Amino acid sequence: MKHIKAIAFDLYGTLFDVHSVIDQCEKRFPGRGREVSTLWRQKQLEYTWLRSLMNRYVTFEQATEDALRYTCRHLGFALDDAACTVLCDAYLRLQAFPEVPPRLRELRNRGLQLAVLSNGSPHSIGAVVGNAGIRDEFDHLISVDPVRVYKPHDRAYGLAEEAFGLARTSILFVSSNGWDATGARYFGFPTCWINRGGNVFEEMGQTPDWDLLGIDEIVRLFDSAEGSAPSV
């Protein structure tokens, strides 16, 4: 791991639990909160991918709102503008996974540069990490907005190279999303897949370099590699 100089983290689902919006969904739709959250996230991802394919970019906030409105129509729920705003704002106050803040500090203390590389807008990324009190742990908060295309497009991953000023082989990419880890691997990043659910990886011609249960294991990865530099 001595060749790794920086780490780029995905935000949604990797550092932060996207389903921490369930509480707000449950308040609005009693007994159906988890169902709403699950379909909402599914459509949010689909809309970012489809818009990239169609070259019809909108901000992540807009894609999130569109996905919520679809979800409510699909499930037959009324959703006025005020309720839509409350629910979408919950995406700005996601809960970090418990191990994330202390492990980020440990990684920084090792001299590694850290960044978020997210499909979120600059505003949404800043709000999420700021509300969680971990903004200062990152050297860069990288949004795909400048290239107007979402991960897993190559141009999105290239933003991390530009921000760090490093070759992609020196940047470890970390994501809990199999499609994201696949895209990063095709781009040429050494890649950790955070596999909290014990799932099988996607069948798209790539495998992650490391299949880990959580962010804690990244620290242990560097611990075990001290004094050696295993190839990726």
Curated annotation (Swiss-Prot):
An (S)-2-haloacid binds at residues 11-12, 41, 118-119. The active site is at residue 10. Optimum temperature is 65 degrees Celsius. (S)-2-haloacid dehalogenases may be used for the biodegradation of halogenated substances and their derivatives which are widely used as pesticides, herbicides and other industrial products. Its EC number is 3.8.1.2. Keywords: Hydrolase. Residues 175-180 are annotated as: Important for catalytic activity. It catalyses: an (S)-2-haloacid + H2O = a (2R)-2-hydroxycarboxylate + a halide anion + H(+); (S)-2-chloropropanoate + H2O = (R)-lactate + chloride + H(+). GO terms for molecular function: (S)-2-haloacid dehalogenase activity. It comes from the Bacteria. Pfam families: Hydrolase (PF00702). The record marks 14, 151, 157 as: Important for catalytic activity. Catalyzes the hydrolytic dehalogenation of small (S)-2-haloalkanoic acids to yield the corresponding (R)-2-hydroxyalkanoic acids. Active with 2-halogenated carboxylic acids and converts only the S-isomer (or L-isomer) of 2-chloropropionic acid with inversion of configuration to produce R-lactate (or D-isomer). Belongs to the HAD-like hydrolase superfamily. S-2-haloalkanoic acid dehalogenase family. This is (S)-2-haloacid dehalogenase.
